Curated annotation (Swiss-Prot):
Belongs to the enoyl-CoA hydratase/isomerase family. Keywords: Cytoplasm, Fatty acid metabolism, Isomerase, Lipid metabolism, Nucleus. This is Enoyl-CoA delta isomerase 3. It catalyses: a (3Z)-enoyl-CoA = a 4-saturated (2E)-enoyl-CoA; a (3E)-enoyl-CoA = a 4-saturated (2E)-enoyl-CoA. One of its GO terms (molecular function) is delta(3)-delta(2)-enoyl-CoA isomerase activity. Pathway: Lipid metabolism; fatty acid beta-oxidation. One of its GO terms (cellular component) is cytosol. The gene is ECI3. Its EC number is 5.3.3.8. PANTHER family: ENOYL-COA DELTA ISOMERASE 3, ENOYL-COA HYDRATASE-RELATED. Pfam families: ECH_1.
Length: 238
C-alpha cells in the first residue's frame, strides 16, 4: 500500500505496488499515518519525498469501491472526500520541505495529493496530469478548487486543469507553471532529481516549524478550507 523510509535527513514515502494507487479509505488512513510518523521524527533539515511504483503515481479515489455500494455510492464518495482532507492538511502542516516525484500518471485526488507538496517533478517520457471530474460528471470538492487557486498562478492554467478535461504532459505542465520540472527519462531519474533537490534543502537545516508556519501563511484560504490555521511565528527564536 505505502511505505516510509528514512535516508539520513530524507523521508521517502512510496505508494507501493503496480496498481493505480487509488485512494481507498484504507490507503488514505495509511498515508496519513505515515505523514504523522514523519512529522514525529522530523529534525532540522528533514525533507519529505513522495513517489510511487509502476505506471501511476495515483489515479484518484477508488471509484469502483464507491460504486460497489450501489445506492450507498454517494455516501462512500463523501466519505473519501471527507477523509482525504486531513491528508492535504498534514502535508501543508508538515515541518519540512515536501517534494512529489511523479513516477507516472497523477489524476483527480492523486493530482491534488501531488500539488499539496512544495515541489512537483514529472517524467519527460511518460505520465500525465488529469482532472477527470468534468469528463465523468463529478463536482470538484471545494478544497480541491482552493488548492488549485493557491498552487496554480495562471487563470489559463487553472482552466486547462479543471475545465478542459485535458491530459497534460510534463513539458506543457511546466510551461503552465503547474509543476517545477519534467526533464527526467525514467521513474528512477525523477526520484534521483528530487533526492538531489532534497539534499540541497536538507543542508540548509531550517527550523521545520517556522518553515511550516510560513508555508501556511502563503495559503490562508486553502488552510481554512482544510481546517488549518496559520499560527503566528514563535518569537523566542527572533
Amino acid at each position: 500500500m505505502c511505505t516510509l523510509e528514512k535516508r539520513g535527513d530524507l523521508f521517502l514515502l512510496t505508494l507501493t505496488g503496480e496498481d493505480e494507487h487509488r485512494f481507498h479509505p484504507d490507503t488514505i488512513a495509511s498515508v496519513l499515518s505515515l505523514l504523522e510518523q514523519a512529522k514525529s521524527q522530523s529534525t532540522k533539515g528533514s525533507v519529505l519525498i513522495t513517489t510511487g511504483h509502476g505506471k501511476f503515481f495515483s489515479n484518484g479515489f477508488d471509484l469502483a469501491w464507491a460504486q460497489s455500494a450501489g445506492h450507498g455510492a454517494i455516501k462512500r464518495m463523501h466519505q473519501m472526500v471527507k477523509s482525504f482532507k486531513p491528508v492535504l492538511a498534514a502535508l501543508l502542516d508538515l515541518p519540512m520541505p515536501t517534494i512529489a516525484a511523479l513516477n507516472g500518471h497523477a489524476a483527480a485526488s492523486g493530482l491534488m495529493f501531488a500539488l499539496s507538496h512544495d515541489y512537483v517533478f514529472m517524467r519527460k517520457d511518460r505520465g500525465v496530469l488529469y482532472m477527470s471530474e468534468v469528463d465523468i460528471g463529478l463536482p470538484v470538492p471545494d478544497y480541491f478548487s482552493a488548492l488549485v487557486v493557491a498552487k496554480v498562478g495562471s487563470g489559463i492554467a487553472r482552466r486547462e486543469l479543471l475545465l478542459s478535461g485535458k491530459k497534460l504532459k510534463g513539458e506543457e505542465a511546466v510551461a503552465l507553471g503547474i509543476v517545477d520540472s519534467a526533464a527526467h527519462d525514467s521513474a528512477e531519474g525523477v526520484v534521483e532529481a528530487t533526492v538531489s533537490l532534497g539534499e540541497s534543502l536538507a543542508a540548509k537545516k531550517w527550523n521545520g516549524e517556522v518553515y511550516a508556519t510560513i508555508r501556511k501563511s502563503l495559503y490562508p484560504e486553502l488552510c481554512r478550507m482544510v481546517d488549518l490555521t496559520a499560527n503566528n511565528l514563535a518569537t523566542h527564536n527572533l
